[in-house]
Amino acid sequence: MPENGRLRRTSARLTQNGTSTSSSTIYQNGKRTSQHAQETSTASNKKRKVSTQSKEDKLSDIIVDFNLAVNELYQLKEYKSIISWDPIENSSANDRGIKAEFEEFVKNNDYRLVWDKEIENNSNIDSLPLRFQKKKLAEQNKLLDDKFSIRQNVLASSKMLEESLVNKTRDEVKIESTFKAIQSQEKAGSKLKTPSQTSNAKTNIRKSGSTTPKRGNENGSRKQALEDQDEIIELSDDSSVVEIESDLSDAETHYRIKCIKKTVPPPLVTHPSHIPQWRPENLEDGNRSTGRLIQLKDSSSSSKIINFDPTPLEIIQLKDEVIAAPKLTEKLQNFLNNDFKTPIIDESNVPDYNFTRDEYNTIMSQQEKLLRKLYHKVNIENSLELNGDKIERRKVILPQSNIKLTDPFRNTFSVKPKLHGAANNATHQDYLLAQGMAFSKVHQQMRKQHHLRTRKIAAMIDQHFKKKKGEKERLAKEREQNLKKMSRLTMQAVKKRWNQAQKVYQIIQNEKEEELKKIKGRQHLSEMLEHSTQLLEAQLTSSREPTVEAESDDNSTTFDDNTNDSDNFSSSEEEENEEDNTQQQINGNKKYDVNGKSNDENDMSLSVEELRKKYADLETSVEPLSSNVTSDKERESETSSEDAESSDDDDTDVTRGLASLYQNDEVADFATTTFEYSAEEKKLIEDLNQESDSRMNSLLDSDSVSSISDSESSEESSSDTEMDQSNVSEPPRSSETGSNTGLASLFTNGTIVSDEEDDASISSNFENESDESMNSSDRELEVNGNGKIDKIASTDEDDSNVEIVNGSKVKDVPIPSLLRGTLRPYQKQGLNWLASLYNNNTNGILADEMGLGKTIQTISLLAYLACEHHKWGPHLIIVPTSVMLNWEMEFKKFAPGFKVLTYYGSPQQRAQKRKGWNKPDAFHVCITSYQLVVQDQQSFKRRRWTYMILDEAHNIKNFRSTRWRALLNFNTENRLLLTGTPLQNNLMELWSLLYFLMPSSKVNQAMPEGFANLDDFQQWFGKPVDRILEQTSAGNSDLIDENERTTQKMDEETRNTVARLHQVLRPYLLRRLKKDVEKQMPGKYEHIVYCRLSKRQRFLYDDFMSRAKTKETLASGNFLSIINCLMQLRKVCNHPDLFEVRPIVTSFAMPRSIPSYYQSTNELVKRQFNKDEKVSFQALNLDVTGCENMNYFVCQSTGKLMTTEPFQDQINKLKILLVEFENSDPINYVSYYQRLRREEQAEIKEKLEHVVYLNNLRCGRKPIYGESLLRLLTVNAHDFSDEPYNKYCLTLSGRVDKMNDTIEKYSIITPAAVALDMKDQLIPISTKQRILHEVAENKIDNPFHKAQVKLSIAFPDKTLLQYDCGKLQKLATLLQELTSQGHRALIFTQMTKVLDILEQFLNIHGYRYMRLDGATKIEDRQLLTEKFNRDPKIPVFILSTRSGGLGINLTGADTVIFYDSDWNPAMDKQCQDRCHRIGQVRDVHIYRFVSEYTIESNIIKKANQKRQLDNVVIQEGEFTTDYFGKFSVRDLVSDSNIGKEITDRTIDFSGDAKMGNVLAQAEDEEDRVAAGAALKEVAIDDDDFKEETRSATTGATPAPTETNALSTTDGDAAFIDVDYEDGIGHIDEYMLRFISDGYYL
């Protein structure tokens, strides 16, 4: 390390540094003290002992020196100085431990001593857990101890030595400060001059001071040593001033204190320059001024420790509390006047202090040298220039001018004078003058430039000194601004900390308040539900009392026979026990247990008369529930009975009905004794009582007759309904006043049946009945506008006319005659339940599962109102746009007697339909859509509607939307909601639907308090649903067992919460599932088919997941980008062509092949190398047979016509010329050229001779036989058949046809590149010319076209469509198996492009199919579905998931195949219900294709969780599905390689509109257009249910929060520190306590 020299001397310097400051005190009067001499001798003795040290002692010294050196180095590196260095702070002798920063410094720089490198190799120790790190270090220490036996002794001795060394240094510092204080006191005492009379007082004071008890420890710190010094006191006695030394506490009272002097000792170390060889680490980065000043010091002085012994600072405090230091003031004044100078420094970061005279002179000389260099560079060398406040290199800027500047001397060598005229007769003088004028202009321009440059330099210098003139003020202002800024930041930080503390305190308080609120809410809920259970049973019994009285008054034998009939007692034992328990509770005679089981004897053994006597006194206990029309005597008797009953049951306030449960002050207490009526009021009450009794008797008489026909009609269907209905019984009816309804109209006579009792009383097929439906109220009321009660219930009907619908007893109503069709048993029960809702003036929700016939039940209800109550309407039915036509067709089919108005069309058409609709019986039923009813809400609000029915009512789940508020204010008598999935997302939606059922005034009268307060409702029932899943599902199963009872797996608390919610919802909701109510319906079996990815799919999937962009996108957390990635992965799983279309392979076409460029050259070279000397036999007439085609006469004529004489004459002449010049040599140019000419002539002569020779040979040819003889002797050949030749030698067209199959089969590999001239090289020229000729005449086509195209363009094989996708491979096998067994399948997919691929797949395999997607029109959809259901020859129907869920009945199919799963499992469930519904006669098998080890397998797990929640909702769940409507990115992407980099972002797919928007943005452009067309119809419904939250209002008013006022006390009690004894503790705790005590406002 670079600090080795310093590290070795650190411990010695530490001791020297600690003792050097006391060197001045050791010498007194030039003599050395004995103490110092003794120390010197001790040090010399130590040096002598070094040589005799053992090995352990040497190692200990090395360790101590090294530790102290590292400690000092850390101090210098961290604080740039050792002014306040405490060696024990980071020493091993420190008991408080070593700082983590020091350990990090040692670790990073590897400043440690190593015993053995191999053993102490800790390179990988940081990657281990903490417990393994400790274990490894312990093992290392053990190995080192085993190897070095002296290690522990060396470490212990080094620690002791280091501790003694550090403590010794600190003790020397304390001794030194104490010695100085004593020395200063002695000097002051020697200078004391006092009269004799004051010396005695001084002596007395010193003596008293000597008896003063000691303060602090004997080994006290430096502060205590300073406090122990005697203080100098000046006493004034008249004119004499005496200075004495004593403690202030010992001063006598007869002295007056004039002033007090205190001495402040100097610091131990004052400057880092006092340490040898110390320099700053980075002079360039920081502390430049300090580094410069240190460099200015003499190098010789830096190698020694400078003795720094300043005199102590004396401070005087006068009587007027003025503190002064006169010596310090004089020193400062002397320094500023003589030694301090401020040089001019052109650096803003250098402060203007700490300059002595030498430093000033040094810096000034440097500045002078710098200015001289700048002057030389700027003015002499002209290499620099002053640009503002910067000195930069000079830039040469050429003047911009349009005039071309030329040098007259260099370019033209002269300046021509300008003269008028064409002639230039200028003389030498003219040229000289012109030259001088031009030169003068040049000098003038240069002079101007010099002037301008001088002005600029002067301006810059002036600006520079102006800036320097205000440098001090500017620096002072900057320092002031910095201080203000620091103060402001500090203030803001403190304020921010207090604000944070206040927020934390507020959060803590809110948590406490929320916890208290939850506790109160649970108590209130428990009390409410307990009282509700008691009073519901009480009202069940009280409803029978008026009937009992009527039976006792009426002695007709018919009624007695009916009541004595054994069928009246066919109800189950469970219901009788409940009735007995209710009566016992009201009478206060007996108690009942939690399950409602009675301890009394069974009422089955009692006769009717005995029962009348037994319950004769029941009226007094339940009178307040019946009517307020009673006499004063009856009220007194009721009051007395109530007083008697209150002593037995204090918890139940029967006089208030259900109002006592909800603490509703608006419900009046009519049963108290405080009511007093006048005479007129009593008379009016009696008249009303008589009138109601007469009307009740007439109604009883009329209903008794109708009950006979009802019973006869019920006997015909008894065989069908025997297995569907449980044991039935009819409790008697009674009426109530409209003012005291509360929840009475909702919960009247409602029985609370436990799960165990349901299993025992209801048939086996109704085991899970409580999972699907809710009870309804039994009491039937109709309140008129004047508050009178019309009793419409008939109590003389047989018990066979009363049935139990899911635990509630409702009246069996007759099937209306207007209804065309037959109702199934459970549909008849639904009609009874709906009729009871109307009779009780209660609204409800029919939440049957999709496919159970909610439409026909609604139509039967309207028909019942028309037939039985003569209520023809008008009724308003609001449905989605896509099913308006379906509703109209259902009305025409099942209830053609109604006038139906389908309200749709343009604004003009709708206005035309509204004309005259206020007339009576203009229409009975109005069917419209959500969108239109909101647009024309003013017209609909002006009309009074009998029933408002909302189909798909779960779409009004948002109570903040404009549509919800608009429909809430419609003028309707009753409301009915139809939904197949009442709870899709959260409990707020359920609250929204329930609140919608009870608008305006019904909220305070007919609803519990919890319904009106969303916060309480959420707090009671809206707990997270993950607890249910933890207990009910393993979460990894592929299939959900819907028949498994989920409640059995819940814990007690969860089961209780579900039971509470059931009790609150039971009057409003009726829900049945197909598997429970429709026993003739076949079973439904679901199969998960895992499909392996094909090789191409796996390659694309892994390639996409391994892309850096994909990892970056998933890790970024951007919502749309993540969805886009997930969509791409789903496309790969569905089919790789959706992600990347298999390309059409084409070859690269080259105009010429590579060999063609050098083929001709190659042939020529080959010909030259293979050239052989050959003899032409034909030219020499040696080819005997070559002349047989010639005639004799032709040969003779040829010989005669031969003319060789001209050639021979020319040859002879050339011979003569050549002979003359044969031996002549060239002697000159002429002879040379003549010789060249003779050589040419000789060559010509040789050619002519060769021509003559060849001509003679050719003309002398003669045949042996001749052509005539050969023709004469030739005989014609026999004509053989050409069939073998034609068989093997085909024509061109025949060869093309024969090779087509070979080309088709074996042309499978497309080359990467093809050459267009290959056919020219392979096909002979003759053949090519013949083909071209025939092609030009259109005789044949190009025979090579197919081979060329087949090789150059390769289209994907159609069979690859199946083999590229694992799902299609599975689908091919599955369809082959299904069609062979006669099954028909529905194939659902989410993506529109998958439908196109499925069409190609079905066409390849030859299956007949039909297609339906979002682009199919509404009128065509019905035709397609009917055609498919009628024609069994069509085995496959492919549909879009969204279009398949919109009012389609496809019972002709018995198999459902989900090619891909929808994000929302509710959509898949709707698709299943299109096949598994009423009319299906075969078992339905559902196959769900899932690509294994992909995103789809993760999606199906989440979908299964939500589907299991569907088994829990409404009956067994905690009614919040937000957990399942959201997906986690990390859960979906199961790739472990990038799982750590992905942000665990939650993706919400709970809303269909949100889902559609996200998918539309994530898909490709082509697929987006196709999906938009496919989802066109869904978009219309989405427009109907589009939420508008801009003008949203809060659904519930939060409860006010109580705030406790801060309690303050008077006097000092408000400021008592209550934490004084325990201590402040952490600052955060102190701030919280400070705020909680109310001091922080």
UniProtKB/Swiss-Prot annotation:
**Which reaction(s) does the protein catalyse, per the Swiss-Prot or TrEMBL entry?**
ATP + H2O = ADP + phosphate + H(+)
Comp. bias (Low complexity): 555-571, 701-711, 1591-1605
Q: Under what name is this protein listed?
A: Helicase SWR1
Q: Provide the species name.
A: Candida albicans (strain SC5314 / ATCC MYA-2876) (Yeast)
Coiled coil location? 461-521
**Bias (Basic and acidic residues):** 215-226, 590-600
Q: How does it assemble?
A: Component of the SWR1 chromatin-remodeling complex.
Gene transcribed to yield this protein: SWR1
What's the source species' lineage?
A: Eukaryota, Fungi, Dikarya, Ascomycota, Saccharomycotina
Gene Ontology CC terms: cytosol; Swr1 complex
